Structures are given as C-alpha cells and as structure tokens.
Regions:
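Solvent-exposed loop/turn segments at secondary-structure junctions
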Residues: 3, 34, 40-44, 66-71, ...
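A ligand-binding cleft/hinge motif common to bilobed small-molecule-binding domains
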Residues: 41-55, 178-193
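Short hydrophobic/charged patches on amphipathic alpha-helices used for structural packing
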Residues: 24-28, 143, 164-168
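A short, structured surface patch at a secondary-structure boundary
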Residues: 1-42, 154
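Conserved acidic residues
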Residues: 33, 173-176
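Short, structured coil segments at secondary-structure junctions
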Residues: 11, 55-57, 149, 205
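Extracytoplasmic substrate-binding proteins
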Residues: 34, 49-129, 207-208
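Alpha-helical, coiled-coil/dimerization segments enriched in small aliphatic residues
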Residues: 2-5, 20, 133-163
Length: 208
C-alpha cells in the first residue's frame, strides 16, 4: 500500500497492463524521458539493453539494490539511490531529509535489536503457487534489512522455483514472507499459515 501522502499522486500515474514488465513497444509508445527499472528489466527477454534507449535519447537508470552482486546494504545501494533521485529531479534537500529519516529509523531498530540481546535465524521466502517457492539469499537487499533487525538469513544463496521439500530442509526461527500481491501483513500471514506444504515448519506453527 502506498503511503497516504503519495497515494493520490501514485493513483494518477498511467499503469500499463503488463503485471511485471511491459513490452518494448508499449514503453516506446509512451515516449518517456527516463526509464527507472530493476536490473532484470534491461535484459534481452524484457526491455532490452539500456543503451538501446540511450541511443533513442531516453535516459535509463538501474536501481542499484537490484544488481545481484556481492552483499548489498542500505548504505551502499538504497541511500545512494535516493540521493540519485534527488539529483535527477532537482529535489536534493527533500532526498537528504528522507534519507536522514530512514537512517534514524534503522538506528532505532538496531538499538532495539541490541537491547533484546538475542538474534534469530530467518528464512526469506516467496511462494509462487503450484508448490513452487523461492528463497532469497545475501545478494538481495532484504538480507541486509533483516540482519539489521536481528535476523540472520539461514540461506546462503538464492534458490528459485524449488519444491517444498527443499524449503522443509531448513528450520528457521522466523519466516520473512515476501508477498508480491501487496496485501496487508495479517492477510499475508494467513496465506502462509494456510499453505499445506509448510504446516510442519515450527515457524509456521508458532506464527513466527
């Protein structure tokens, strides 16, 4: 759900029909000045190479946190991304203020984590339906966010389109459930608990 302060502006944007990535023809037809996307958007199977758009006079920006290289952190990817957006759109002061607010929130979380005196093992899980799952490894920014909150990823590499038997091979203290449908947190928890493949996982039984 979009923050209330931005909901009206977001609702006014034209939304293309494609659920994930529009076609190249759709993008070109919109005559954009700038494309901002994830790294996998600019592949031969999706929108094509960024330089094809630059040659057309269209700027292209790849969100740093989506470049699967190393172990991305908020400090190395998210904060610079916000700074770049501030520079591109001429709102550097607002971008700096927003980043400072995020840093304060992260610091507060890290302080609570330290005061708790305990860390948890976590699985970062996404369900695709038809008994297929993905587990996120350290190449995703969510790994750093979880670590800052006191949860250590039990998975050391990305696992895509795997069956439940692979998921059940792990026993995390908690499950961080990635739900792309943008549903409320409680609805996502209900969905996870209702998955018949995962009923025997301790984290699911204990609603964690």
């Amino acid at each position: 759900t979009e923050p209330p302060a931005y909901a009206e502006a977001y609702a006014a944007l034209p939304i293309l029909a494609a659920p994930y990535v529009p076609s190249r023809e759709e993008v070109v037809a919109l005559r954009p000045d700038l494309l901002i996307g994830w790294s996998h958007h600019f592949t031969p199977e999706a929108l094509g190479d960024v330089y094809a758009y630059i040659d057309r006079g269209v700027g292209a920006y790849i969100v740093p946190a989506t470049v699967r290289r190393g172990h991305p952190t908020l400090e190395e990817t998210v904060y610079p991304f916000i700074a770049d957006m501030g520079h591109i759109f001429g709102v550097e002061d607002r971008a700096t203020a927003y980043t400072n607010g995020l840093k304060e929130r992260v610091a507060a979380v890290e302080m609570r984590t330290q005061a708790r005196g305990r860390r948890y093992t976590a699985m970062i899980l996404q369900a695709h339906g038809n008994s297929l799952y993905s587990m996120y490894g350290p190449a995703y920014i969510i790994d750093d966010i979880a670590r800052k909150a006191g949860a250590d990823n039990i998975v050391d590499r990305q696992m895509r389109a795997i069956g439940p038997e692979r998921v059940l091979g792990f026993a995390p203290d908690v499950i961080i459930y990635v739900n792309p449908k943008n549903v409320p947190p409680e609805e996502a928890r209900v969905e996870l608990r209702a998955d018949p493949n995962l009923q025997h996982m301790k984290a699911v039984r204990e609603n964690r």
